[in-house]
């Protein structure tokens, strides 16, 4: 996903429904689709914690719509 320009990445909002470990999450998007997501590198560096029920912004590659990357956690 890192090699695509920003215009080609799809951004969605969703809610964290399941935590697998510190870096893997299941997110349900606003349209009801469930994705397996991991957190972005900047969120790892800044130790941003995500728990069940958090609203997040998810970035999805148009080539693989089953996986996503959490790029922002709403306050």
Swiss-Prot record:
Top-level lineage group: Bacteria
Disulfide cysteine pairs (residue numbers): none
One Pfam family it belongs to: eIF-1a
Presence of keyword RNA-binding: yes
Function: One of the essential components for the initiation of protein synthesis. Stabilizes the binding of IF-2 and IF-3 on the 30S subunit to which N-formylmethionyl-tRNA(fMet) subsequently binds. Helps modulate mRNA selection, yielding the 30S pre-initiation complex (PIC). Upon addition of the 50S ribosomal subunit IF-1, IF-2 and IF-3 are released leaving the mature 70S translation initiation complex.
Family label: Belongs to the IF-1 family.
Name under which the protein is recorded: Translation initiation factor IF-1
Organism whose genome encodes this protein: Mesomycoplasma hyopneumoniae (strain 7448)
Lineage: Bacteria, Bacillati, Mycoplasmatota, Mycoplasmoidales, Metamycoplasmataceae
């Amino acid at each position: 996903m890192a090699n695509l320009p920003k215009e080609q990445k799809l951004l969605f909002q969703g809610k964290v429904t399941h935590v697998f470990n510190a870096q893997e999450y299941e997110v349900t998007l606003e349209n009801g689709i469930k994705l397996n997501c991991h957190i972005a590198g900047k969120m790892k560096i800044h130790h941003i914690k995500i728990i069940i029920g958090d609203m997040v912004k998810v970035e999805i590659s148009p080539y693989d719509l089953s996986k996503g990357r959490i790029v922002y956690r709403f306050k």
